[in-house]
Amino acid sequence: MDNSRPFELEKMQAELKEAGLDGWLFYDFRGLDPIAHSILRFASGKMGTRRWFFFVPAEGEPSKLVHAIETAALDHLPGSKTVYGTRQSLDAALQEILSGSSRVAMNYAADNPYVSRVDAGTVEKVRSKGVEVVTSGELIQIFESVLSPEQLESHRRAGAHIRGVVDEVFALVGDTLRAGRTITERDICDYANKSIREGGFENDHDPIVGVNEHAADPHFEVPAEDSAEVRPGDLLLFDVWARETKPGSIYADITWCAFIGSEPPEEMLKVFSVVRDSRKAACERAHEAFSSGEEIRGCDLDRVTRGVIAEAGYGEYFVHRTGHSLHECIHGNGAHLDDFETYDDRKLIPGTLFTVEPGIYMPDKRIGIRSEVDVYHTGQGAEVTGPPHQEELVRIEI
């Protein structure tokens, strides 16, 4: 994360007032809360082995609570400092910091592990001070997921590059097989990584390259050796993501599928059309809501894709959420499109970016189809970035 940005105290206090909260209580122990580290602009690699609290009240000066052997832990932040040593002194200081507050946010949520970084024991401790603890999920989005104009442009550049990588990969497969040579999942993976790096981009993991039953494994990892060959009659799934290497750059993430040959099986074509239609339905619903000012949540869009797939008879084969937040990390800290694995009831807010990537996975039939696009909330509508988008199953002629 780019933690060189200034800490936004005035904006945070304005948002706390808008939400009707008395404050936002941050906490960490041994790096358990990377969201807090990002919002509070910790330097990367900063060591910490003791508990600290940082309280931002809706009005007034923030409060820092740090241990006696790490008194400088929060020195980069504004506010008064209290140093504790014993657990009893920590409890007393925390009680004092929270006096006058009745309702505070923490990085916690009942059914959303992406937000819930504070352990249950610490939440209980805070509640024992007579304070109601509510989730900071909506606040996290505001400070962690809204793109600057420069960040949006970095995403566009990444999207254009990986869209080109998709075309390069499919051309490579066709050229190699037509020449009578072999090509494996690992060959494709290595080629994509090379193209990403030579273009001035980076990724945090190999792309997903899956043939047949491997395509039906949503997070298949290509082995370093003895990966599957790509042959005529195969289905190929290619999921690729990247960002620019400079700090603050935003990821792009897309998935395309191809058939090696000219005549895909009818069921494969049907599955692709269902997945594509579910993707488009979610994008259209997002645009409808965003353009009218209607509030819509991540879980709501998950239900849209899931409904289309279930109605077509493939509901049991859609085994993951519809999409995730995109930011400086491939899985960002904004609202995810999820009412399946978790319950993400956070609103989709202007200036944020997320994926829409429904899929149907039938390993027994050696079919796995996913279609993934990136969607930006412009404030007036939903922009599906990185065109052209996949409308038909690609046929790689041999």
Pin down the residues of each PLM region.
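Active-site neighborhoods and metal-handling regions in enzymes and metal-associated proteins
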Residues: 1-398
